Amino acid sequence: VNAYLVALEGGKRFASVGGTSAASPVVAGIVAQINDRRLSAGKPTLGWLNPALYKCGEGVFHDVTTGKTSGGIVGGFPAAKGWDAATGFGTVQYKPLAKCLVAN
């Protein structure tokens, strides 16, 4: 699924993109915004993100339970309830994530 719409030629054309190459910069932007909010609150930036994500818990993600990846040696991985190799914990929900990461 191509989840992002990218403007080209100054907004004259649009293209849909997906995958890690699209998602990684989006998540980097989310973390940058949260770090800015933390600095404004007199707190340090997050640093190593994994411990903070696990502290927030699965409630800051939308669990993707259908679909599967394709390719690879095993022919892809199915999405499932909870953590899975296809979607991890799922998609980030910005507001709950920001609330948790700015508060802690």
Residue ranges, per PLM feature:
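Extracellular protease catalytic domains of secreted zymogens
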Residues: V1-N104
